[in-house]
From Swiss-Prot:
GO terms for biological process: proteasome-mediated ubiquitin-dependent protein catabolic process. It is found in: Cytoplasm, Cytoskeleton. The gene is spe-26. It holds the Pfam family Kelch_1. GO terms for molecular function: actin binding; ubiquitin-like ligase-substrate adaptor activity. It comes from the Eukaryota. Kelch repeats lie at residues 244-291, 293-338, 341-393, 395-440, 442-487, 489-535. One of its GO terms (cellular component) is cytoskeleton. Transmembrane segments: none annotated. This is Spermatocyte protein spe-26. May play a role in the spermatocyte cytoskeleton, possibly interacting with actin.
Length: 570
């Protein structure tokens, strides 16, 4: 029997009918009340046993339940449930077209649920399934994941979906030829080729010249390039870095700003994005989780904020999330991401009613999956302008200002036990500093000790003490930002004796990228955030940049009005 409307008779949309599944289970529906029922009526066949009542559809009972909303796709989490979901997707894939919008919606819902499980161990399988069922948008997302993570999965972690080793050589070549493949070094492409060939060396070694033609000759050092010349590597330009540094907000020209700037490592320059923040902000927190940028707290210059925003790189629209539990200012360096959740500690809470500013000892955590902030255990000390970082599965919170004095204390938060404990104090009290994990070392960078801004770098040693590194910043700076990027420690902008535009790089790791210097940021600023944005290059390039020369230029001057309390009062 063909499953299409036979048009042998007309069923009034106001009448009750029954949808009959392939398993012969009956579902009473009112066509006038259900768009999906009307779609099933259009594609189903009238039962010859009851021409006025029964509509036979080409779907199993489980699929009909999903379509009629009797069961939720998201409730299927066990092995049998996943089998049923895949079966339902197979059944409705051919009908999930624009002429059946509700069925198409269910097809996308099922694909979304399947995509939520995307990981290193199933990415190739999911990509194959999405292509098989003509789910183009979801196939594109799995391909994006594969291209970004391929070298890491195969070369670094050595843990990848077994379907990778089953790919035909043409697909392997297509993947490795892409501009979007994310590599730290081009030699990783060679190792990916070696691993795929090794899975069936006897039959695949003959494909080596074909695959080696995807290696970018210009991205190899001279010795390696010479050894591979027999394979005729590609003369295309080196692949561009997928991860970029972004600067979020900050104090600019005596006021908070709404700018996003990003660093282009291939051209060694900073660019100003067309994308703006939802409001002007400084001394705020920001984080990227699963590719989404979150923005929270801080100050507009007139008011301490508690709002949380998120930015979709598909629509470039800011959406409001659940507010923080309390307004928090001076949290530029005291928020971190751990296990997919955002933690923030301390800060200053300005009380609108009493018109007083109170330093905070509280902490809170935001879960993007539930869109909620919840309390954490409290710090022992009140502190704003402190710094936090994840190190060895714990969160270190150091230094800061309690409203009366600068602190040297360090507290360690255990996210699993939700408890703080004290550890060894810093060598001296410090605030407005940076704390970061670079090269698997926990480092204190810069800051203000109450008398002068520091250019020293201190390293936490596992013997239980802070040790000074011989390397130093060129400028002592506070209320700056720092991060680990492409094997270097980056120190960006901040406050010296004036607001800075300069950037410094130091402490290169063995395989660090080659930078001779890092140019100044487009405008001097402090109280900013700097983040490594994984796989954001394409997003930012598509969004577009602003030509700085065409922007209104203000006179340069010392911008001490935007410095933190400890920066301008000591």
């Amino acid at each position: 029997m063909r499953f299409c409307n036979s048009k042998l008779t007309s069923i009034d949309n106001r009448c009750d009918v029954a949808i009959i599944s392939k398993d012969e289970e009956r579902f009473e529906v009112k066509l006038v009340e259900s768009e999906i029922a009307r779609e099933l009526n259009r594609l189903g066949a009238l039962s010859p046993r009851s021409m006025q009542k029964n509509i036979l559809v080409p779907f199993t009972t489980q699929t009909v339940k999903y379509l009629l909303g009797l069961e939720k796709v998201s409730d299927s989490t066990d092995e049998m449930g996943w089998f049923g979901i895949e079966k339902s997707l197979e059944e409705i894939a051919g009908f999930g077209q624009h002429c059946f919008p509700k069925i198409l919606e269910m097809k996308n819902t099922i694909c979304d649920h399947i995509l939520s499980t995307l990981s290193d161990v199933n990415c190739f399988l999911l990509h194959k399934k999405f292509r098989e069922f003509d789910c183009q948008n979801h196939a594109h997302k799995t391909l994006e994941y594969i291209l970004y993570n391929l070298a890491r999965m195969v070369v670094v972690d050595k843990r990848v979906d077994v379907e990778f080793y089953r790919l035909p050589v043409e697909e392997v070549k297509h993947l490795l030829s892409s501009e979007e493949v994310n590599v730290e070094q081009e030699t990783q492409i060679i190792e990916v080729i070696n691993q795929w060939i090794a899975a069936d060396f006897e039959n695949r070694d003959k494909f080596r010249p074909m695959l080696m033609s995807t290696v970018r000759f210009l991205a190899l050092d001279q010795q390696i390039a010479k050894s591979l010349s027999q394979f005729h590597p590609s003369l295309k330009p080196a692949r561009r870095t997928r991860d970029v540094l972004i600067i979020i907000g900050g104090w600019l020209h005596r006021q908070a700003c709404d700018r996003i700037e990003w660093f282009d490592p291939e051209n060694n320059c900073w660019k100003v994005s067309q994308q703006k923040l939802p409001t002007t902000l400084a001394y705020h927190g920001s984080a990227i989780v699963d590719g989404i940028l979150y923005l929270f707290g801080g100050s507009t210059g007139q008011r301490t904020r508690c709002e949380t925003w998120k930015l979709s790189t598909e629509t470039w629209q800011w959406d409001r999330c659940n507010n923080m539990m309390e307004p928090r200012n001076y949290i530029s360096n005291s928020s971190v991401v751990y296990d997919g959740r955002i933690y923030v500690f301390g800060g200053q809470n300005f009380r609108e009613i009493t018109r007083t500013a109170v330093r905070s000892r509280t902490g809170e955590v935001f879960d993007p999956k539930t869109n909620k902030w919840t309390e954490t255990a409290s710090l022992s000390d009140m502190r704003s302008d402190c710094a936090a970082e994840v190190f060895e599965n714990q969160i270190y919170v150091s230094g800061g200002f309690n409203g009366d004095m600068i602190l040297a204390s360090v507290e360690v938060y255990n996210p699993i036990g939700n408890v703080f404990s004290r550890t060894v104090d810093l060598p001296y009290p410090i605030t407005g500093h940076c704390l970061l994990n670079h090269g698997n070392q926990l480092l204190i960078v810069g800051g203000f000790d109450g008398a002068e801004r520091q250019n020293k770098i201190w390293m936490w040693h596992r013997t239980g003490e802070w040790q000074q590194r011989p390397e130093k910043l060129i400028y002592g700076r506070s209320t700056s930002a720092a991060c680990s990027y492409k094997g270097w420690l980056f120190s960006v902008a901040g406050y010296t004796e004036k607001v800075e535009a300069t950037c410094e790089i130091l402490l290169p790791e063995p395989n660090a990228s080659r930078f001779s210097f890092i140019p100044d940021v487009p405008r001097a600023k402090s109280a900013l955030n700097v983040l490594v944005a994984p796989n954001w290059r394409n997003f930012l390039e598509r969004r577009g940049t602003i030509n700085e020369q065409s922007m209104e230029m203000d006179d340069d001057y010392e911008d001490d009005a935007g410095a933190s309390y400890m920066s301008i009062n000591n």
